[in-house]
C-alpha cells in the first residue's frame, strides 16, 4: 500500500515540478503509471505462483478459488494506495511535496486528494488495473484542464 501510495504522490508532484521539457514530464508520468501496473501484476503473479506451491491441497483442488481471490485484490490495492496519501497531503515533511514551491505544492496536494478520494470511493468500479490507471490519467487531465 505504501509503495503504491508513493508512486501516486510521485505522480501528483511530477505534474507540477520542473522538467527539461513537457515530453520528459509525460514520459515520467507514463513510467509511474506503468510502474503501478507492473507492481500490481507482479503481486498477482507471485500470489498465484505461491498458491500453486504452498496452498493446502483442499484449496488447490477447488477450481477457481485462487483466481477469485486474485480478482478481489484490485479494490484492496487501490484503497491501500489511496489511504496513506491523506496524511501525506497534510504534512510538509513528505519529500515529494516538500520539493515544490507554495502554489505548485498546493496544486499537487489538491490533485493527490482528488485522485486518492476517487480511488478510494470508486475502487470497486474497475475490473482491471489498466482501467484504474486509465481513470487516473483521465481525472488528472480533467484537473489540469481546469487549472488553465
Go through each PLM region and give its residues.
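Active-site activation/catalytic loop segments of kinase-like enzymes and analogous catalytic loops
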Residues: 1-55, 81-99
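Fe(II)/2-oxoglutarate
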Residues: 51-60, 74
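ATP/Mg2+ or Mg2+-diphosphate-binding catalytic cores
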Residues: 63-148
Amino acid at each position: 500500500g505504501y509503495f503504491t501510495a508513493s508512486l501516486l504522490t510521485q505522480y501528483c508532484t511530477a505534474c507540477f515540478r520542473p522538467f527539461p521539457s513537457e515530453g520528459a514530464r509525460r514520459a515520467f508520468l507514463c513510467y509511474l503509471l506503468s510502474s503501478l501496473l507492473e507492481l500490481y501484476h507482479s503481486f498477482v503473479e507471485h500470489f498465484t505462483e505461491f498458491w500453486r506451491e504452498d496452498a493446502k491441497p483442499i484449496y488447490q483442488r477447488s477450481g477457481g478459488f485462487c483466481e477469485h481471490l486474485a480478482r478481489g485484490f484490485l479494490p484492496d490495492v487501490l484503497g491501500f494506495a489511496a489511504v496513506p496519501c491523506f496524511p501525506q497531503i497534510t504534512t510538509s515533511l513528505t519529500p515529494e511535496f516538500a520539493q515544490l514551491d507554495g502554489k505548485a505544492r498546493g496544486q499537487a496536494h489538491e490533485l493527490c486528494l482528488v485522485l486518492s478520494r476517487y480511488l478510494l470511493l470508486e475502487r470497486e468500479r474497475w475490473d482491471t488495473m489498466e482501467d484504474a490507471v486509465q481513470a487516473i490519467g483521465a481525472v488528472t487531465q480533467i484537473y489540469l484542464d481546469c487549472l488553465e
